[in-house]
Amino acid sequence: MGIFMIKRLKKRDVKVPLTVPEDRKEEYIKNYLELTKRTGNVMLFAGDQKIEHLNDDFFGEGIAKDDASPEHLFNIASKGKICGFATQLGLIARYGMDYKKIPYIVKINSKTHLVKTRDPISRALVHVKDVVDLKENSGLKILGVGYTIYPGSEYEHIMFEEASRVILEAHKHGLIAIIWSYPRGKNVKDEKDPHLIAGAAGVAACLGADFVKVNYPKCDNPAERFKEAVLAAGRTGVLCAGGKSIEPEKFLKQIWEQINISGARGNATGRNIHQKPLDAAIRMCNAIYAITIEGKSLEEALKIYYGDRK
């Protein structure tokens, strides 16, 4: 699988949303170019699961012992090649003083999986103003915010309104806004259906998101079918969720196809990175980054991950 050429963006190439005030346009452009490494693509390290999945993803069979401590996430983010590390504000406040060079995306809302409801709802834990205050008071490299919506839930209207306000407030301060968009609820028959995923991507575009994180479809020929979501999102860049840990070769091949066949603008990976020991987690970051940001081939990415180990 050959190399996909990635264009280097200049300031003038960034389409600044009209919701960004004139005096914040430079800040928005700076954050956008930093987050995308001047490519328009994003390799996001997702570390918000300590609320979402409690300790299930961090302790147990097949999970590295390193992962039992939250600091494992920060060690990976500080040593691996990433565009941004997404996690909750509270965790950043507890560890950020020792990891000031990490580019952060603050996850605004989260919920646990303990409440067994067919129609999920996830509300804001903090306000965008709290994020801005942390950025200004700490000097941390906070580039944007993230928010999860569940289209199809009977509570979607609550999340849509809150997400819309989060995006507007983020843009007012020159921050990037990323939406996690997962169709869920008693009326959703198959959340991995490619047509439904495309709809979820389009919802994020209508809310004004800069990027949207969605699940990769489970179907025949997913790389081709996923093109519908990329088209539906328009100028909102589509990022693929990493999902459960799978074999590195299979995962990196999927990443390559998402970028080079489907036209996705990146990925947001959690378990396939942090469930590994630190050295392997760093190598996985570097391999994903090589495909997403550097335009490397699958073979080159596999060599970065395995080195002489295979």
Swiss-Prot record:
Which residues does the Swiss-Prot or TrEMBL record annotate as the active site? Y182 (proton donor), K213 (schiff-base intermediate with dihydroxyacetone-p), K213 (schiff-base intermediate with substrate)
Q: Which UniProt keywords apply?
A: Lyase, Schiff base, Transferase
The Enzyme Commission number assigned here is: 2.2.1.11, 4.1.2.13
Q: Which amino acid positions bind substrate, per UniProt?
A: D48, Q49, H53, D57, W180, R184, K213, V214, N215, A241, G242, G243, G270, R271
Q: Which domain of life is it from?
A: Archaea
Give the record's pathway.
Aromatic compound metabolism
Xref: SMART domains: DeoC
Single GO term (MF): fructose-bisphosphate aldolase activity
Q: What does it catalyze? A: beta-D-fructose 1,6-bisphosphate = D-glyceraldehyde 3-phosphate + dihydroxyacetone phosphate; beta-D-fructose 1,6-bisphosphate + methylglyoxal = 1-deoxy-D-threo-hexo-2,5-diulose 6-phosphate + D-glyceraldehyde 3-phosphate; beta-D-fructose 1-phosphate + methylglyoxal = 1-deoxy-D-threo-hexo-2,5-diulose 6-phosphate + D-glyceraldehyde
Q: Read off the InterPro entries from this record.
A: Aldolase_TIM, DeoC/FbaB/LacD_aldolase, DeoC/FbaB_aldolase, FbaB-like
Q: Which family does it belong to?
A: Belongs to the DeoC/FbaB aldolase family.
Protein task: Catalyzes the transaldolization of either fructose-1-P or fructose-1,6-bisphosphate with methylglyoxal to produce 6-deoxy-5-ketofructose-1-phosphate (DKFP). Also catalyzes the reversible aldol condensation of dihydroxyacetone phosphate (DHAP or glycerone-phosphate) with glyceraldehyde 3-phosphate (G3P or GAP) to produce fructose 1,6-bisphosphate (FBP).
Q: What is this protein called?
A: Fructose-bisphosphate aldolase/6-deoxy-5-ketofructose 1-phosphate synthase
